[in-house]
Amino acid sequence: KGGLIDASNGGSLPGATIYSSTSNKGTISDFNGNFSLDGLKAGEASIKISFIGYATKDTILSISEGENDLGILKLNPSSLGLNEVEVIASIANDRNTPVAASTLSGKFIEDNIGNQEYPEILRNTPSIYVTKQGGGFGDARINVRGFDQTNVAVMINGIPVNDMENGRVYWSNWAGLSDVTSKLQVQRGLGASKLAVPSVGGSINIVTNAADFEKGGSASTTVGNDGYTKYAVALSSGEMSNGLATTFQFTHTRGDGYVDGTKFRAYSYFLSTNYKINEKQSISGTILGAPQWHHQRYGYGSYDNLHLSDYSDDATHGRGIKFNHTWGTLDGEEFNFRRNFYHKPKAFLNHYLDFSENTTLKTSAYVSLGIGGGTGPRGRVQNDSGRVYDSFGGYGVGIRDGNGQIMFDNIVAYNQGNYSGFNDAPNTAPNTTTSSGDGFIRRASMNSHSWYGILSTLDHKLSENLTLTAGVDARYYKGEHYRRLENLLGNTSYVSRSDDNNPDNEITVASPAEFGNFLDRSYRDGNNVLNYHNDGLVSWLGLFGQLEYKNDDMSAFVSFNGSQQGFKRIDYFNYLDDAAPGSDTAQATDWQNFLGGNAKAGFNYKLNDNMRVYASGGYFSKQPIFDNIFLNYVNNINPDAANQTVTAAEVGYGYFDGKINAS
């Protein structure tokens, strides 16, 4: 018998495999990391201990008659710097941290994800609701305790990924995460994060793989329904003699989608490097991204003349649950008015410094760049009687065939003056169109952003049981929002009259929606901008501190943090270029600053090795989102913009053994 712990932090290792090739006997460790291997013969025995994420331990033991106590055995993490990343990410210990948390290992995700979307792996987690929404690739959303994603903090390696303007999370931007996740943890309620993040409903902490200690590689293929195919390859150099270790992973995923007209294609890449400078200092770098495009099933309105019965299997009226009213074919290929495309790479540079056994400094600098958007229709079809089928009031009516698919080839012919079959609606201005004229184009609503930040945490052990933590969280974000012409659909140009500085802008350049292209500057070079063009700027400075007490039976903490967020809007369409700075007609507003933060406290008491009780509570003051500060999509400042405040308290009981984990 014996026990297994993590050599880096002393945590128990449940579910590890212990196997003796000498006697062909094996077992697994229980929830506390303890194990008992029976049936070994006296004499020398070969023992192999393995656990996902840890270096395999091989040893030869001398076994005597009777019980043999091996004591506590330590396993070293196979990924370098992984424990430090978990500290930055505020990963809770399921039995010692006074929050309700559920943790999934990378091995569990790998074994169970299949061709599900990343959030769907959490659908059986308490207090979690996951839906695929329209059914497009990456369009899933998640609710924690009923709160939507704007009130759930999502963090990768401790770095927040909620949009800096509206707090949303777009899972299609992170399609490759399931392949590189080391640990996924959901904390319900205010959670254990030290940052002033929007964790009213809870937080989702994702820790990615780090550079692997062992040299090796792997390749895999996954196939599924509706043409789903995924190829993956991973390579690791292992730790080399110069202290450098590098791991690389790449995937390609494609399919037709379960819902009609929702074809998709996605790539993902991951590169992590760790360098051990000396015994007290190391650095690591990680880059990950997932360029993708996918067709969507967009919501419908009453003007589309659609009803729930259209999605039934009724032979008379229904078209089935897969019905999608936004797609058709163009030149024999699938074409959809609604297409999402994006590329959002994120890079981390982490530095770990041990001043002494009692004092450590962990710093993560990061940058996130994003470009892409979503397409939709623009224009109208109008007949002699004045009936209009336009992009606002029924683009699915009058232009669909008997199967409910949009007749895109006919739209192209109509735009060129060669077709008049839409309810006898002749095109009065072929080969050109405006939003108030005849014909359709496909536009793309774009979001191009740059996000820079640094997170630094200092930990100091005041005593054997007491630890003080303090840190800084600084961020700067700039988001550029505009629409561009994506497909002329047979027209030669599109006339936009929305720009006060260029009221008769004839656009002839179309920029295809293929992934997210950082090199595409046609919206500037070709003046390909329509409907709107504005920038959103957000600055963030936060300070945090925590005092934690811990012994064998209990733990308690109290934490405080505060942040200042600044918001600024620049509008290039609704205000003239030569307007006086600082005036009511200026393109740029002044910075609008808001203070916020939270205070939390909690304690956890272990009744025995299997049971615990805990309590926590806190007060949270959350700054308003960008759109609640600037009204009506212009520079009008909301005089009533104010923080949201939340007071929360929680009492809980937890039970753990080798088979049951209840809280």
Where are the regions that the model predicts?
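Short, acidic, small-residue-rich periplasmic hinge/interaction motif at the N-terminus
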Residues: S8-N9, A16-S21, K48-Y54, S64-D111, ...
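Short acidic/polar hinge/loop motifs at secondary-structure boundaries
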Residues: S36-G39, E110, R141, P160-R188, ...
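A beta-strand signature from Gram-negative outer-membrane beta-barrel systems
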Residues: L73, A175-S218
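Extracytoplasmic beta-strand/coil segments of soluble accessory domains associated
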Residues: P119-P160, G176, S182
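Transmembrane beta-barrel wall of Gram-negative outer-membrane proteins
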Residues: G216, V223-R254, V259-R297, K346-E357, ...
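Acidic/polar loop-and-plug regions of large Gram-negative outer-membrane beta-barrel proteins
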Residues: S282-N350, T375-R443, I507-D525
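Membrane-embedded beta-barrel scaffold of Gram-negative outer-membrane proteins
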Residues: T360-Y366, K606, R612-G618, A642-S663
